[in-house]
Amino acid sequence: VYNRRYFDDHLRDLDGEFTLAMLDLDHFKHINDTYGHLAGDAALSRAAQAIRSAIRTGDELVRYGGDEFFLLFHDMPRNALKKKLESIRAAVENLEFPEYPGLRITVSIGGAHAVGPLGDTVQKADQALYHAKAAKNRTVLYKEDLQ
């Protein structure tokens, strides 16, 4: 999993056709407060593993900070994006933590397909994520009427 520095140094100048998804673990502060920071670390680590297992070789997973991740898809057909993001959401939701009875995690995902500068797409994916987080454990794709 790449980190924010990688994103800032290598991906900020990305231009062309690509798809960006922003992922945010739901209720992460509650996990830390209820189960402890080791459980929070386990949640982050296993979520990253589940996401990594669900994406294709060449797609890029970045832990942007805290409980936020970015996914950069190259050559992801627009009509396949929702299905892919839903499979990632389900993979995270189905994680088990036998060492922390009762711990369940979910993720909210906002995605945007774009042709153009990365910065514009980050804003669009962030808007979609905002709408996904309003209900938690959802996947929302950017469209003009989200504004």
Locations of regions flagged by a protein language model:
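Conserved long alpha-helical elements within nucleotide-processing catalytic cores of c-di-GMP signaling
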Residues: 3-19, 26-56, 62-66, 70-74, ...
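Alpha-helix C-terminal capping segments
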Residues: 7-16, 55, 92, 97-98, ...
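Structural motif
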Residues: 17-20, 59, 104, 109
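Core hydrophobic beta-sheet residues of small sensory/regulatory alpha/beta domains
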Residues: 20-22, 111, 141
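Catalytic core regions of nucleotide second-messenger enzymes
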Residues: 63, 92-107, 133
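Catalytic strand-loop-helix junctions within cyclic-nucleotide turnover domains
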Residues: 72-81, 101, 107-124, 144-146
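Short alpha-helical N-box/ATP-lid segment at the N-terminus of the HATPase_c
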Residues: 89
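Catalytic/regulatory signature loops of cyclic-dinucleotide turnover enzymes
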Residues: 124-146
